[in-house]
Amino acid sequence: MNEFKQLSWQGLWKNNPALVQLLGLCPLLAVTATVTNGLGLGLATTLVLIGSNATVSIIRNLVPNEIRIPIFVMIIAAFVTVVQLLMNAYTYELYQALGIFIPLIVTNCAIIGRAEAYASKNPIGYAAFDGLMMGLGFTVVLVLLGAMRELLGYGTLFAGANLLLGDWATSLKVTIFTTDSPFLLAILPPGAFLGMGLLIAAKNILDKRFERMFAAKQEAKVVQRARVTAET
């Protein structure tokens, strides 16, 4: 498996920042009441990851080891500021909905963790791709959790997509059922904890199933090899 495939596998599944490392849970649990909010925060985090990883990789040989962490945090803060200003300019209503959790991207341990553990030790191409895959892995979890909570809480999917994608996205809204009052357990933080627990449990179940399938295939290969050897 080459490096790019390994980075994709690590970011999207095996070492997913939300489901495995359990990083960035504060914004993940707080703003994922809808798919749109989750997707908006996920894309913002992904842009910061790509930019900060690439920059850290470029200057990795110039930064004194003793002060590398403060410098990495300053780089991350700079990219968060850029993303914040862009959202303020082009997606203002979504910017207001996400509120304080956009600047709090600076404190996301997944970002500083990747800058320290990977970007500071690898070339820019690998570092940027690592940021992309980690960001996409985080975004997928945000979107799935947002979809679960929005569906159970409001009976809709992609409500408010126009806040992120423009007026044309208004037609993306899907109404599964109508309700006079939302299901509060789903749209409040307790529902986020329950939904996150279900996603983690589902991943663990799939991992164990894949391990059993792989073990069975390996055992079948060993038996086949032994049979061929015995026949010869």
UniProtKB/Swiss-Prot annotation:
Q: Which InterPro entries match?
A: NqrDE/RnfAE, RnfE
The membrane-topology field of this record reads: Multi-pass membrane protein
Residues passing through the membrane, by range = 18-38, 39-59, 69-89, 93-113, 128-148, 182-202
- Which Enzyme Commission numbers does its entry carry? 7.-.-.-
Q: Which NCBIfam families match?
A: PRK12405.1 (NF009070), rnfE (TIGR01948)
- How is the subunit organization of this protein annotated in UniProt? The complex is composed of six subunits: RnfA, RnfB, RnfC, RnfD, RnfE and RnfG.
Homology family: Belongs to the NqrDE/RnfAE family.
The function of this protein is: Part of a membrane-bound complex that couples electron transfer with translocation of ions across the membrane.
* Name of this chain's protein: Ion-translocating oxidoreductase complex subunit E
The species this protein belongs to is Pseudoalteromonas atlantica (strain T6c / ATCC BAA-1087)
Q: What is the lineage of its organism?
A: Bacteria, Pseudomonadati, Pseudomonadota, Gammaproteobacteria, Alteromonadales
- Gene of this entry: rnfE
